[in-house]
Amino acid sequence: MFDAPAPLVAFLSLAIPQACAVCRAGGPGLCGACRVAVAESLWVGGPRRSRPDPEPRDLPPVHTTARFEGALARLVTAYKDDGRRDGGRFLAALLAQAVEASLVGDRRIREALGSNGVSGGVSSRPPVLVVPVPSSAASRRRRGDAPLVRLATLAVRGFGPGEVAVADALRVRRRVADQAGLGALGRHLNVEHSMEVRPRWAADVGRCACVVVDDVLTTGATLGEAARALRASGTPVVVGAAICATQRRGGGSRPASRAPGGAP
């Protein structure tokens, strides 16, 4: 009988996970019980606008699909930090709904999609760019990839090819501390002026509407900084989308309204 070398076994266990990403029960991906548990975190009626309290000055309108809690919180963490990329399609479907809600919720973007242009002129780019919040170089090295870019790429597959494209257009320009454990003010000061548009994307960002995306909306500091960097590069319109929003006592994200038209 063939005995697979230990490194091969370790590789296969990552490539073909043999346990639910949430509860660790047998079977790859996400088990039926955990799918139900994740669904319980979804906003009733579909994606809605979420607003942190206090709300950062630079934060654009942000739509989310669910609360960051329970099984969904564990799935997001497993995908991002534990290498469980097999949960990506499930999370991407939730992110796609939030992106769609942000597109529908902004009149200027609706008009841009209808006319296939934002600021005029000829461009090979679609009128809307989905821009993931950037990871630091250290995070990319540690994880081996950029999980949010992968997630955004999966999320836009259901949109028309001439409507929306993913743009890894932002980069971190200075060192920032881990946001965990910081309050709203601490998070804002930590990421303030920490991002910039990559030079090769500057022209496209300057003429396209942008949807800046993240996995979780907490205080809004990160999405707000990303939006600031895009505006500084001239983007005519910027909105935001995230899979889920935290619900924190004494200051956190609060649902503001349901997205027009509900879930796509």
Language-model features, listed with the residues they occupy:
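Glycine-rich phosphate/pyrophosphate-handling loop used in enzymes and phosphotransfer proteins
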Residues: 1-264
